[in-house]
Amino acid sequence: MSNSTALFQRARQVIPGGVNSPVRAFKGVGGTPVFIQKAAGAYITDTDGKQYIDYVGSWGPMVLGHNHPAIIDAVLKAVPNGLSFGAPTEGEITLAELVCRLIPSIELVRMVSSGTEATMSAIRLARGYTKRDKIIKFEGCYHGHSDSLLVKAGSGALTLGQPSSPGVPEDFAKHTLTCTYNDLNSVKCAFERYPQDIACLIIEPVAGNMNCVPPKPGFLQGVRELCDQYGALLIIDEVMTGFRVALGGAQAYYGVTPDLTALGKIIGGGMPVGAFGGKREIMEYIAPTGPVYQAGTLSGNPIAMAAGLACLTELSKPGNEQQLAEKTQQLAEGLKTLAKKHGVPFIAQYVGGMFGLFFTDVPEVTNFQDVMKCDVAKFNRFFHLMLEQGVYLAPSAFEAGFMSLAHSDADIEQTLKAADNAFAVLA
């Protein structure tokens, strides 16, 4: 019995499902999850001592690679001063100043401890600011596990939301309208039906929770125009895309300006940090300057602020943004070439430092329904074939992959060699 198997059995005795976040259980791909002992650069090492090239990167934060010296040094320097104060520190100001410089649409920013807190708080703020209740989200887009966002579409854009998780009251979920990603007409119809009721529209600018689905040209701009037309706030959820698709986020890459932005993952450099920010007028509606309440015991934690500042400072260095995108392109295009070589129906979609792998014979995946038509069983086989060869991909056909600056040309070539073998088996 492997150490991972033994640990998983032990974990299930005291942790629901043996994990602290569901996707880690390998339920989507089958088998026993890999338990990690340590990580450095582009590599993770499991509890049996096997090393893997990692394309999960803690689900996005490790854009510099694991255990980056600049981040570790910043954390070690901060720790002797104390772990938490529950009071303001200079570090949170410095990180906020950097975030506002990198993302110009953010004039004021509030630190929290997770991406879920960021999106949840941004939506509460939007509702309070507009004095409206309904929100729009998109089928297949995930914005954390707050109640109003755990809703998936019924048949058609105008169907009132139904809870997609037990424990979410239908009376609460009915305020969430679900539209089709990359379909402006579905958004227009929702606004036309509830012209005075929609507080905000929240969107992943690149849908990374149905693998990796970029927006069609003009889609984000069209959403922006509809929000303006009907007086709703546009919230761009950059928890995954922020600082990864581009240094200024996907909003900079695609040229669209939101009213509010949610951040997470990279902003903490591996520590638990989220943030939401936007126009000064709107952000001043949050307590203590305004009536909308939001608080957090560990918000602005000094150790987490030090890690986040070190990460963004390093990532901001000239050439890093382009280098990250080039590495991602090298991997994705290489995979497409190998799949074609072996006659395996497959496409790879990518933007900046994130990518998605789809086993399908269509040339492009543009929404959740397209994703659901992909061959999940074939992805699962591919995942395990790669895992056996020391390549750790996201253990789900519905999750994006993440490149880091630590991945070398040799790492990518080794990954492609493993993929060549895997595609040969799948052919």
Swiss-Prot record:
InterPro entries: 4pyrrol_synth_GluAld_NH2Trfase (IPR004639), Aminotrans_3 (IPR005814), Aminotrans_3_PPA_site (IPR049704), PyrdxlP-dep_Trfase (IPR015424), PyrdxlP-dep_Trfase_major (IPR015421), PyrdxlP-dep_Trfase_small (IPR015422). It comes from the Bacteria. One of its GO terms (molecular function) is transaminase activity. Keywords: Cytoplasm, Isomerase, Porphyrin biosynthesis, Pyridoxal phosphate. It catalyses: (S)-4-amino-5-oxopentanoate = 5-aminolevulinate. Its cofactor is pyridoxal 5'-phosphate. Its EC number is 5.4.3.8. It holds the Pfam family Aminotran_3. GO terms for biological process: protoporphyrinogen IX biosynthetic process. The keyword Glycoprotein does not apply. The modification N6-(pyridoxal phosphate)lysine is found at K265. It is an enzyme of class 5 (isomerase). Pathway: Porphyrin-containing compound metabolism; protoporphyrin-IX biosynthesis; 5-aminolevulinate from L-glutamyl-tRNA(Glu): step 2/2. The keyword Cytoplasm applies. SUPFAM superfamilies: PLP-dependent transferases. It is found in: Cytoplasm. GO terms for cellular component: cytoplasm. PANTHER family: GLUTAMATE-1-SEMIALDEHYDE 2,1-AMINOMUTASE, GLUTAMATE-1-SEMIALDEHYDE 2,1-AMINOMUTASE 1, CHLOROPLASTIC-RELATED. Homodimer. Belongs to the class-III pyridoxal-phosphate-dependent aminotransferase family. HemL subfamily. HAMAP family: HemL_aminotrans_3 (MF_00375). This is Glutamate-1-semialdehyde 2,1-aminomutase. It comes from Actinobacillus succinogenes (strain ATCC 55618 / DSM 22257 / CCUG 43843 / 130Z).
